[in-house]
Amino acid sequence: MADKRKYVIPGDVVTTGPFRPEQNTVLEGNKIISTTIGISEIYDDSVRVIPLTGKYIPKINDLVIGKVNSHTSLSWELDINSCYVGFLPAQDVFGRDFSAHADELATKLRTGDLVAARIANFDRTRDPLVSISDRDLGKIDSGVLMEISPSKVPRLIGKKGSMIQMIEEATDAAVTIGQNGWVVVSCESPEGLLKAKKAIQMVNEQAHVANLTDQVKEMLDKKGES
């Protein structure tokens, strides 16, 4: 069974002893050193580091969009676009009267369902707990899932929400943005949906461009194009 995972940066000693260095690690004397930012794993006699490039690192109170992977009798496991998985306790959904014997989790959330949730607890040494107990959280019943780089999320939101507000007002779309880089777009109009998706993709691909807001606005203002 694998040892507990831990967050490492280049130069960190992952472990010492008779282990075989594998992905993103090197052997220096009897020390196995990480060569990248990532999560270390020790399995049997080998050591590796899973790189975090492009992946989301959870932070407490972050809003995330998760996809249900599976469930036990006590919780759901969510894919949150991270090297970590999110765990949603059944009691968070069923309430205080939840009974593992009487309540069936699949009646609330099934594999493949999307949920908007918040990171409730996380310390890098274990997978995070997520919660849907706040207002506007829970199962997402409609919309198209998009993925952008988590590092581009602040650009998509914009200063005081200016970018996403502009996109929503121009397309009549409703956009839910997860800090993990997953975005759900809902719109009754097919044209509005396509235009909103195009705007979001522009932000993802051109976040470094100085006049990006003007370019997105120009695209949104064009009639009959998507």
Swiss-Prot record:
Transmembrane stretches, by residue range? none
Q: Can you supply a Gene Ontology BP term from the record?
A: RNA catabolic process
Lineage of the native species?
Answer: Archaea, Nitrososphaerota, Nitrososphaeria, Nitrosopumilales, Nitrosopumilaceae
NCBIfam families according to UniProt: PRK04163.1-1
Localization annotation: Cytoplasm
Q: How does it assemble?
A: Component of the archaeal exosome complex. Forms a trimer of Rrp4 and/or Csl4 subunits. The trimer associates with a hexameric ring-like arrangement composed of 3 Rrp41-Rrp42 heterodimers.
Q: Which InterPro entries match?
A: Exosome_RNA_bind1/RRP40/RRP4, KH_dom, KH_dom_type_1, KH_dom_type_1_sf, NA-bd_OB-fold, Rrp4, RRP4_N, RRP4_S1
Q: Which UniProt keywords apply?
A: Cytoplasm, Exosome, RNA-binding
List the source organism.
Nitrosopumilus maritimus (strain SCM1)
This chain's function reads: Non-catalytic component of the exosome, which is a complex involved in RNA degradation. Increases the RNA binding and the efficiency of RNA degradation. Confers strong poly(A) specificity to the exosome.
Q: Which Pfam families match?
A: ECR1_N_2, KH_1
Name the UniProt record assigns to this protein: Exosome complex component Rrp4
Range of residues in the leader sequence: none
KH domain mapped to chain residues:
141-200
Q: Where is the S1 motif domain?
A: 61-135
One GO MF term, please?
Answer: RNA binding
Q: Which family does it belong to?
A: Belongs to the RRP4 family.
Record GO cellular component, one term: exosome (RNase complex)
